[in-house]
Amino acid sequence: WEKQINTLIKGGDRAYYRESSDEIVIPKRYNFKNDESYLATFAHEAVHSTKHKTRLSRNNLSYAQEELVAELGAYLICNRLQISNLDTMNHAAYLESWCPMLKSDPKILFKSLAMSSKAADLVIGEQ
């Protein structure tokens, strides 16, 4: 990455990307059911970090579309790195919450897939 992302590992049960300080905050490993779940959560937040103006500058998206990009991107990262966190029921339930947005504009799915692929490439270092 052109600009490294700061990662804070701390207590609590919530992972998130804080754009104002450009950092990923993630709970300690023991808060997750396994290593794969921990890594998948980190991948999700790493995709969020690519929206920063010093990376892919994706600040024009709605919250729902940004979450869709992050979830799809995390799936791509895990798949490419052979992280077997394919909890498809969890992914499906999470993605299902964005169905109303997709019904209102089906092109959003394809736009989101393209953005998530770019983000995954950046996180992995293939861009």
Predicted regions located by residue number:
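Glycine- and acidic
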Residues: 27-30, 55-59, 98, 102
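A hydrophobic alpha-helical transmembrane-helix feature that marks the membrane cores
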Residues: 10-11, 58, 65, 83, ...
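Long, well-structured alpha-helical subdomains associated
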Residues: 75-127
